[in-house]
Amino acid sequence: MSAPRSSPSPVIAITGAEAACCLGEDLEAIMSRVKAAESGLAMLGDFGLPKKRGGWIADRKRMLHQRYGPASALAVDVAKRAVNARGWSREDLAEAAVFAGSSRGNAAGWLDAWPGRKRRKIYAASNNLHSEIAAAVSIELGIRGATHLLSNGCASGLDALGMAMLHLRCGLAKRAVVVSVDLPLSPALLGSFAESGLLSANDLNDPYSPKTSGFFPAEAGVALLLETSPKRPAEAWCELAGYWTTSDAYDPIGAEPKGEGITRCLTSAVKAFPKRRIAAICPHGNGTPAQAAAETTALKAVFGGEPEKPSLHLLKPLSGHSLGASGALETAILAHSMREGLLPPNFLNLTEPAKGFMVPALAQKLRQDDVVLNLSVAMGGHNAVIALTR
């Protein structure tokens, strides 16, 4: 799938965002720690893994609701805060669409009991629906347009953004609320990741290091607001300018060693902007050795021959890996930074994937016509890229 914007296609702008994760309870708090390159990871003793690190949302009340599962409750929380900050009216919301992305949905609330939640039996069936996340946002915000839930593993958040962009570009709505939530810190889910050998075994928080051994699981909830207009609105944080996906057709869990699917996805994105600089990439960088190898090979294949390579901005060393919510969280962070004409700094002393690829420890300035790519990769060999422009 290839979907760059070309005239006279309308502008699809990100005009607001909210989030909660281990870095903070709102996007401003999160950005404060991102700008300081401060990680929010800590030992998971309270979650049954005292020798592993991960990230959790401190305010557990955000995930408590009698009608909805914990992921749905968090989606409603971040969506309401984003919409209130933007000032959408009741009429605006009624005509909007909802696109949700989640890898595990409300699994954390029905595979294991959610601490502190007093659920109602009548909602037992709806609480184990992934689509309850989108439905809850629609119900609680009065959104009467399309509602969709995308569940493509760790690429779910970017897919929700991309599909929302296409929906608006086709003229089916003027506004969309994109939410992405994952809560992987339940005993059942953590056990499955550990059994599959995906969690970090040596506590090394450096995704491209030869010694990297796995990811750090983390919770997150994110809402992004999209609006369409003939010209870019003054309130825009940045423009959502393209969306591409490919599949590896290789293995249910392992990354294709040569990174061929990632290469095709990135190549499609680059070709969509022949006269503009690809200034930066937020790579998937989840910390598993297989993903590091595939991603490195793809980056070298696409950009290795370029005299000026895009800088890399790895955000999972700060936020942990929130599965399907990770791409949306990274997009919110990038959009907030781009509004200020900057790219976020990296965690200190990260390894470069290959010679010439800069992983800057300080925030970088953006030019007006720069393009920023965000990459997500999911189990099953699903790859997604979005393009953001100022």
Annotated model-derived regions:
Residues G16-E18, F99-S102, S151, A176-D182, ...:
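Short beta-strand segments
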Residues M1-I14, R90-L93, A236, P274-R277, ...:
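Flexible, low-complexity linker/loop segments at domain and module junctions
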Residues A3-S9, L41-A73, D77, R104-M163, ...:
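Conserved catalytic cysteine-centered active-site region
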Residues S7-C21, E25-R53, D203-A280:
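Condensing-enzyme catalytic core mediating Claisen C-C bond formation in acyl metabolism
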Residues L172-E195, S200-N205, T212, Y243-P257, ...:
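Acyl-CoA/ACP chain-elongation machinery
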Residues L74-R86, I133, G221, K258-F273, ...:
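Short, well-ordered amphipathic alpha-helical segments that serve as non-catalytic structural scaffolds
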